[in-house]
């Protein structure tokens, strides 16, 4: 069974419409690209389509000096929001982005300020994909007391999703696994909800899951010219599974667009660091 995300996207669109009324101009999003792979190009194409649809001025910049470009657009009054495409070029790390990006323009929620503030629920923005994961899970089931296993410990998905799912009011029990985790299949089979965010095409098959489990597929991989997830589609025969494409990625892009309008609206002085 495939999990539908249309209702979630409609709710985000409604929020965007409300924010647009408060922003009397076309907000500008700068997407910095270093060394895009096929999955990155696919996501940027999605950005282009959605930016046009929602009335966002999207500028995609091929960056040869990410640090200097971050400084440039941090200080540019015409730029409301900044996105950094992955993968990063050798020599750059996630910490470089976290240190240099302006938290007010950090619509991905990856700055040191926003990541640190997540522990106190005071962030300006949270990572878009992690928020998409949480929204889909909450739209599908009550997470209180649920056992959730996350495959992957990235700063954009695994770690922030774990923090948000454990917050008071959600109260899930979360296990974050990684490449060094032993007895991985035994751990995943004990979960009520499995989140796959490892970037390996069709890695999760029926041997990782149990019947009736909710499986959130975060993966965007290109195989033979087609986009596939981290989860084999056959898993949908015994589990509730988000589709790829059309699942987490679609919600993530909608959240990013909403965050651009939030950043533009916050320029008026509503934001408190």
Swiss-Prot record:
Keyword Transferase: no
Any one Gene Ontology BP term: purine nucleotide biosynthetic process
Swiss-Prot/TrEMBL keywords: Amino-acid biosynthesis, Histidine biosynthesis, Hydrolase, Methionine biosynthesis, Multifunctional enzyme, NADP, One-carbon metabolism, Oxidoreductase, Purine biosynthesis
Pfam family, one: THF_DHG_CYH
Pathway the protein contributes to: One-carbon metabolism; tetrahydrofolate interconversion
Protein's UniProt keywords contain Amino-acid biosynthesis: yes
Catalytic activity: (6R)-5,10-methylene-5,6,7,8-tetrahydrofolate + NADP(+) = (6R)-5,10-methenyltetrahydrofolate + NADPH; (6R)-5,10-methenyltetrahydrofolate + H2O = (6R)-10-formyltetrahydrofolate + H(+)
Ligand binding (NADP(+)): 152-154, 179, 220
Entry-linked SUPFAM superfamilies: Aminoacid dehydrogenase-like, N-terminal domain, NAD(P)-binding Rossmann-fold domains
GO cellular component: cytosol
GO molecular function, one term: methylenetetrahydrofolate dehydrogenase (NADP+) activity
EC number assigned by the record: 1.5.1.5, 3.5.4.9
Superkingdom, natural source: Bacteria
PANTHER family with a match to the protein in the record: C-1-TETRAHYDROFOLATE SYNTHASE, CYTOPLASMIC, C-1-TETRAHYDROFOLATE SYNTHASE, CYTOPLASMIC-RELATED
Family listed: Belongs to the tetrahydrofolate dehydrogenase/cyclohydrolase family.
Self-association and partners: Homodimer.
HAMAP family linked: THF_DHG_CYH
Function: Catalyzes the oxidation of 5,10-methylenetetrahydrofolate to 5,10-methenyltetrahydrofolate and then the hydrolysis of 5,10-methenyltetrahydrofolate to 10-formyltetrahydrofolate.
Protein name: Bifunctional protein FolD
């Amino acid at each position: 069974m495939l999990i539908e995300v249309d209702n979630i996207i409609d709710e985000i669109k409604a929020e965007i419409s409300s924010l647009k009324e408060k922003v009397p101009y076309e907000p500008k999003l700068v997407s910095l690209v270093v060394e895009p792979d096929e999955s990155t190009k696919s996501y940027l194409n999605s950005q282009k389509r959605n930016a046009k649809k929602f009335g966002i001025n999207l500028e995609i910049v091929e960056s040869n000096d990410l640090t200097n470009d971050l400084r440039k657009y941090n200080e540019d009054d015409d730029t409301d929001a900044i996105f950094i495409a992955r993968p990063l070029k050798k020599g750059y790390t996630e910490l470089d982005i976290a240190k240099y990006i302006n938290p007010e323009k950090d619509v991905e929620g990856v700055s040191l300020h926003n990541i640190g503030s997540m522990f106190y629920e005071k962030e300006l923005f949270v990572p878009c994909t992690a928020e998409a994961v949480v929204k889909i899970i909450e739209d599908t089931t009550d997470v209180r007391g649920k056992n959730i296993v996350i495959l992957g410990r990235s700063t954009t998905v695994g770690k922030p999703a774990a923090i948000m799912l454990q917050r008071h009011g959600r109260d899930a029990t979360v296990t974050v696994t990684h490449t060094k985790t032993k007895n991985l299949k035994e751990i995943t089979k004990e979960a009520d909800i499995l989140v796959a965010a490892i970037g390996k095409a069709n890695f999760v098959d029926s041997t990782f899951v149990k019947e009736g489990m909710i499986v959130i597929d975060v993966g965007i991989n290109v195989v033979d010219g087609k986009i596939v997830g981290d989860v084999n589609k056959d898993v949908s025969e015994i589990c509730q599974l988000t589709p790829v494409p059309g699942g987490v990625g679609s919600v993530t892009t909608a959240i990013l667009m909403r965050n651009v309008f939030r950043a533009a609206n916050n320029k008026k002085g509503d934001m408190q660091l």
